[in-house]
C-alpha cells in the first residue's frame, strides 16, 4: 500500500483565490482593449491619411468645365494615354473601398458569381455573368450598355446623406472612398468613369434622374458603335441619351442632305427674273438648258434691230442643230451688228406686227441679213430688172434701188423702208470688209470676199434662203404710192393700220 501511494502522485493545479482572479482579469481585459483600440486607431489614421491624399489629388485634378478638355477614348491603352486626372480618379482607391464593396454584396445579398474584391481601375471591366461584352475591352462602354439591368450608381455624386452601409466590417472609419466625397459638379461632369457592373438593384432607388447631366457630353466619344440591350422599363435613367459611334468632335446635329428639289428652285429665279426682255419658262418646274436655248425668238432682236438681224444672239448660243457648214458661226458673228445704229435714229412709233416666220431650216440660224438678201436676189435671174451683176468680178448694180429697198422692207416687215435707210446699212459693210462702193458709179457695189465663201455662207447646206412674196396686205390701186414718195409720215402710218389687223402667228407689237 505504501508503494501504491508512493506511485500515485496526484497532479494538483495550484488554486487561485477569487481575489487573485479578480485582480488578473482586468489586466487581460485592458491588454485586449488596448490591442483593439490600437488597431482601430492605426486603421483610422491610415484610412484618414489616404482620404486626405485622395482629397488633395482630387483638388489638384480639377480642370475647367469647357468643351475643350474631353478625354479621348479612342486609344488602345486607356490607362497609359488618358489624362492624369482621369487616370488618378479611375485607379487609385484604398482597400477600404474594396472592403466596402465586399460588405455591400454581403449585406445586401448580391450573388452574381463575381469575386468579392472588385478593382475599379480601367483595366478590369468585367461584364456581368451571362452577358457578353459588346465591344472589345479597348473601348470604354457606357454603364447603360454594359449592364442595362443595373443602372450606374451614384458614384462621384453625393446622394443626400445616404452613405453605403458598412455591413459587418468593423473599424473602417469614415469610408474614404471617392464615392462618398462631395466634389463640385463641373468636375464630375467632365469624366465618364467606368462603374462596376455588379452593383445591387436596390442602390438606384435613392438616386434622382437629374444627376446624369454629363452623359450628353460623351454622346459622340466612342470609336465603335454600341448597340444597347432593350431598355428595361421603370429603371431610372433609361431615357438618357445612349452612346453612339463618335470621334472627338463636339455634339452637332448632322446636317440633313439637301433635298432634290433645292437645286431646281435655285435655278428657277435665274431664268424667270435674271434676263429682262426674255420670256421666262413656265413656273411649274425646272427647264432644261436646251429648253432655255430655244426660248428666245426673233422678236427679241427685231424690237430694236430692224433691218438686218444680228446673229450674235442666234449664231452660237441659241442654235439647236449644227449639222453642216460648221465654220459658219465665226463669219456670222463677224457680220452681226451692221444694221443696228441707223434704224435707232427713227423717232416714229412702230406699230407693225412682227414678220410671220416660215420656210426651210435655213431660218434656224437667225433672221436674214442684208448681204444675204442681196446675194439671194442676185442669184435669181428673175430679179435682173431691178438688181443684176455687172460682169466685173463681184460687182452688182441696184438698177431700181427703191424696189430693192421695198423688197427688203417686206422681208423685214418694215413698209417704211427706203433706199436711204438701206444705204446706211450698207455703209457698215464697208467697215466690216464685206463689200465696197464702186467709185464714180451710182448704185454700184461689189463684194470683196471670196466668191465661194460668199455663196457658201449665204446658202448654208446648199439651201436658198426663203424670201417672202409680195405683202400679204392687199392694197387698192389708189392706196399704192410710188416708191420714191414713201415717207415716215403719220398719214402714211394711218393708211397702213389696216394691215396690222391681219392674223399673225406671233403678233408681238414693238
Curated annotation (Swiss-Prot):
It comes from the Eukaryota. It holds the Pfam family Ets. There is a cross-link at residue 350 (Glycyl lysine isopeptide (Lys-Gly) (interchain with G-Cter in SUMO2)). PROSITE patterns: ETS_DOMAIN_1, ETS_DOMAIN_2, ETS_DOMAIN_3. Residues 368-448 bind DNA. Ubiquitous. The keyword DNA-binding applies. One of its GO terms (biological process) is cellular response to oxidative stress. Residues 175-185 have a biased composition (Pro residues). Transmembrane segments: none annotated. InterPro entries: Ets_dom (IPR000418), ETS_fam (IPR046328), ETS_PEA3_N (IPR006715), WH-like_DNA-bd_sf (IPR036388), WH_DNA-bd_sf (IPR036390). Belongs to the ETS family. Binds to DNA sequences containing the consensus nucleotide core sequence 5'-GGAA.-3'. Interacts (via C-terminal) with ZMYM5 (via N-terminal 120 amino acid region). This is ETS translocation variant 5.
